[in-house]
Amino acid sequence: TKIEWCDSSWSPITGCYHACPYCYARATANRFKGCDIAESGEADTFVVDLKERLKVTNKDGVTRNAAYPFGFTPTFHEYRLDDPKTKGFGKTIFVCSMADMFGSWVPEEWIVKIFDACKAAPGHRYLFLTKNPQRYIDLYNAGILPDGDEFWYGRMPAL
């Protein structure tokens, strides 16, 4: 990653409904999208759950992996859950750099699966950022938010 404060980024969720005008992630995802299924600001409940990687074919017949097959529509890339196990040991990993993992539209089940994947790959430092810090509190109160030294939580300013 080119982000100076982490060694790696890992985005098992991509996409967001905040519609921030300065969002680099939205621009990147839309540049490499496969198709349009939801527009920015559309219903905050529309999400996609992918079990395996998709490929897209462009108008010239070239097929490629689709990192963001649905643009910036919130998408859970479940096939990426084992990625931290491949990153060696002792890395600082920015989790969901291409999404707000704690947005109100993200199903709790997705969050739990990501925390479980982090726990299954110990020895890293996992960094989480959100514009919805209330979700941290809700998950903590529900006994879901991990509190070990390897889990770091922060917030981004809301619009």
Model regions and ranges:
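Conserved Radical SAM active-site core
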Residues: 1-159
